[in-house]
């Protein structure tokens, strides 16, 4: 019995728990064993061995006496309770451990799963990349195979081609002819060898062909060089340039062409410098230099720099001056004079080193379109003794080759650039032009024979025209040369008079260039008042501060002008303009000139190429804006021919340096004008998220699309917008504010530096939560585009309002953004930077002398900026209908008591709705306000122009922070119709607020329909029968009470504010009938009183009677 007692004295209870299951519950030892476990069995002070001594006594006492069954039952219950608690605790520990292990395993499984998925994705990506690479390789192989097959097919076609077709591979016939050509070069003809027939001469092979690409072997010199200018054998080919001997006419190797032209351009130098071989310029050449000028700019009408290469076409003059060749007069047959034949072969090889390949266009050599003649009509003339015989032979050859439509003229005073006569009977559009040029030069040389006594060298640039008279030559030996195309040159003048004429032309051309610069500056001012209907463009317009953007606009956007659909005016479309430009490019921009008999032919254009080159350059910009119209220009022999082109001046920005018909301003149809420009779309937050910003570019895009879809836009006149100038903006805003928001980093440097000192150079913007910048949390700013966009919005409205006020348009609707009626003199707020409506009203008064302007602002927010601009101005009446709520709605201004100040007292009317949106203000309230306040005051004011700040955020669909009212879009159409009864219908609406796209599109459609006098949908019957809300009636009563002191017309509407529209209309009708009846009664009473007065008046004693007229 001691062991159980000792166990009871131990602090742990595990032994007793283990014994319980083995011992029957009804046995006495169980009671003995469990008793110490009970909470109240032993005092807590007992412990250790000291507490064990009295236990046997108690146990023996318990065993001695009978145990109470109730107490034993209670003990058992307590034991069971403790047992359950122990088991529950063990379960909790076990569950906690299980949950811990489960979470650990779950995390391990997730990590393993993620790792596995990552590996799978990497494998898939690698596999996809491999597949793409294989696909790319297969595609590349397929392309290579196709290219190889194409080349093989081309080679096969070339091998099997007919001999008459072109080929880049030299055929046997070409090689044989080249060999014959080289052999003929080794045998120089003697001066007396005049018996060469034309078909046998190596230079006459071109006569068998009719195009540039079919011209045969090259000559030793440039095409058409006379025999006296023949080069030493292989002279050019032994030079340092190492030019290839020949290329076939159809050679497609563009790289070789570019390399050859590059070498030629590198070797070209000023025509006035000494030759590299040290050859002294002849006396005649020095005289030519004195006549033509001292600079390279005189060498070409196009003012091309010498040696500018293939990208800068030079005239024939510059070609000869640079190269020493006479390429402009290729068909003058001359003999080799003794002094020229004595030239050593090695004396000046570099003088003729400019190789001219028949396959290259060689812009600086020869006429634009001289073609060869069929080799059947020109025969050799073995004997030629006098100059007259040479001229006779020339005329005979012309008669054989073709008939002249005009008589042969003496051309001593005609510059070569004006020669052009139509040849009949020639299949080529430029046939026999070279022969005609030759005959005219013969006649000219005969009259200028005093200049031929000077010893001449082969490289003299002016030798050709004067040597003709003294050389013994034959027309039958005229050398043939290949025709040149895509050239910008003209024949070289062959007389001092012609050279002086050329100098005059170039001086006049420089004068025209200066005039062009002046016209561009003048065009900036004229464009502001010019009228050119167009489709909206995406480019900045002309402003004083952005000259670079102006030029880009002229080149990039001016061509986007579109005629208004349904317009009765005849305006060329963009397709027509492109067709005209294509035709001009095909004709080489030649001017068509009528001859004396009134007949024009295709040969006249090339002869005027030099004079037209300057015009083409002059009208490059304007050509994209306006259609070209060619006028007849007389062939004037005494004046400079600079009066050939005239343009339809549909825009004042076109260059006006030439005499042309007077400008006719574009006449707009008397209808509704609409202005819109896509440049305003660039004003957006830099974050690019339009969902965060209610005022975004989609607003005006949606309205423009809606007007297009409904067909309303086609009935309107589309007006071309522009940017407002800084001076125009400063009519309302301060200079600091204007420079702050009206300039961008691009044009800010052009302004006066003194204006940028101070806060502007250190301007700071607020960082928005979206990542962009802005003036406040709503008014975003884009440093690069916002300044131009806000100025474009102002300028568009100004242009439209000016046209309406001037009577050119009936009315107008401006689809512009950002809005402006919150912008004050020096403050930007509420999405607004510049107050477009206020600026427009100021400019109307200042520039068009408009007397009185009415501004109606039905945006749900008060136009605090507009009110501030005209608060003391009696010439501008400002009426605003807005949500006020006792100053608790943005911007908090616009109380009914704000009626103006100073001389403008009473010219500020605020219909300030109060009471919140319970119930919301709707159609009935707005129509009642117009009936009782707006229209009576407006009629009494009698404005000259009505401007409307057309904000549509009161339309149903806008939430309470940005609106909350329930006005329908149809209602705004009826309000617009009422305003059209003012100012003779001169009403201009400018978009302000409104951010629900559907709502603003519906409202804009309704307003444009009203402006176009399209029948509007009638108001619902419920609206006509509904009475205004109590809050609205209270607001209107307060407004009438305040404004009746300044406008007596509103006093009579104070009693009928609570009536419905039907009741009000019935009352007005009855009142009108009563007034009419009273007026009739008063008129009748006056008439009766007048009759009675007349009856009672005494009759004169002697009233003369009418006498009969004497017969």
Swiss-Prot record:
Record PTM text: Phosphorylated by AMPK, CaMK1, SIK1 and PRKD1 at Ser-250 and Ser-489. The phosphorylation is required for the export to the cytoplasm and inhibition. Phosphorylated by the PKC kinases PKN1 and PKN2, impairing nuclear import. Phosphorylated by GRK5, leading to nuclear export of HDAC5 and allowing MEF2-mediated transcription.
Biased composition (Low complexity): 485-495
Presence of the UniProt keyword Translocase in the record: no
Assigned EC number: 3.5.1.98
Compositionally biased region (Basic and acidic residues): 238-249, 263-272
Region (Histone deacetylase) location: 671-1017
Active site: 822
Region called Disordered, residue ranges: 40-63, 107-136, 187-272, 474-495, 527-611, 645-666, 1086-1111
Catalytic activity annotation: N(6)-acetyl-L-lysyl-[histone] + H2O = L-lysyl-[histone] + acetate
Residues where Zn(2+) binds: 685, 687, 693, 770
Source organism, top-level taxon: Eukaryota
Keywords: Acetylation, Chromatin regulator, Cytoplasm, Hydrolase, Isopeptide bond, Metal-binding, Nucleus, Phosphoprotein, Repressor, Transcription, Transcription regulation, Ubl conjugation, Zinc
Principal subcellular localisation of the protein: nucleus
GO BP: chromatin organization; negative regulation of transcription by RNA polymerase II; regulation of myotube differentiation
Subcellular location: Nucleus; Cytoplasm
Modified residues (Phosphothreonine): 283
Residue list for modification Phosphoserine: 250, 489, 600, 650, 1097
Cross-link (Glycyl lysine isopeptide (Lys-Gly) (interchain with G-Cter in SUMO2)): 35
Motif (Nuclear export signal): 1070-1109
InterPro entries in UniProt: HDAC4/5/7/9, His_deacetylse, His_deacetylse_dom, His_deacetylse_dom_sf, Hist_deacetylase_Gln_rich_N, Ureohydrolase_dom_sf
Bias type Acidic residues, positions: 572-610
GO molecular function per UniProt: histone deacetylase activity, hydrolytic mechanism; metal ion binding
Domain commentary: The nuclear export sequence mediates the shuttling between the nucleus and the cytoplasm.
PANTHER family hit by this protein: HISTONE DEACETYLASE (PTHR45364:SF12), HISTONE DEACETYLASE 9-RELATED (PTHR45364)
Entry protein name: Histone deacetylase 5
